[in-house]
Amino acid sequence: MIKKFPAHRTSAIFMGRALGVAALCIALGGCGAMVAQNPSSSLKPVNAVADAQDSRVMLKGADVVAYFTQGKYVQGTPQIKSDYEGVTFRFSSAAHKALFDKEPKKYLPEFGGYCANGVAYGIPWGGDADTFSMINGKLYIFGGQASKDGFEVDTVKNLALAEKYWKEEVAGSNSMIQRSKRMVFRVPHYKNGEEIAKEVAAAKTKKS
């Protein structure tokens, strides 16, 4: 006979296991993604990966300055880079590196480079360098066009939610633990992919 637990207890058990795995990874110094995304600095957590000799590369090496100077995604090169707060930033030109070195905070992607729509749900996850938006002179990354479209159904509301959860929960947290928590204990306004798609379709119909 299969023993069934109440929903709240099942969630607690799942969360406990997720946190246990995260703690084990920390203790062993393993889990490459966790290590890359959680520098011991004020930038923690960040959407970064290990690549070649660099253990923590922001946005898989995208040139963060190019979004501001060229208005588009441009891949940086490993030969032109800067380290800031324990994170490596790559650039497509020496000129862009110089701009970053002079004023790094100006060019940092918001929410650690994670998908802004995910952060609105308290989930630091995803973020594709080629899907972005510039809002009030700041860089926001999204985990694909569907996420960007969902966010832009109500940019003001969703930006406020993202800023709230980033400030109250995500900033300074361990990305894997925070992600696991909010994948189980979802925020009141949580929407799945299908619900977001319907919301986007309705918004487009209303505009047409």
Residue ranges and their predicted role:
Residues 32-85, 105-208:
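Intrinsically disordered, low-complexity terminal tails and linkers in eukaryotic proteins, enriched
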Residues 1-14:
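N-terminal secretory signal peptides that target proteins for export/translocation
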Residues 18-30:
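Bacterial N-terminal signal peptides
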Residues 4-5, 18, 37:
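Absolute N-terminal positional cue centered near the fourth residue
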Residues 81-99:
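Beta-strand cores of secreted/periplasmic/IMS beta-sandwich domains, seen most often
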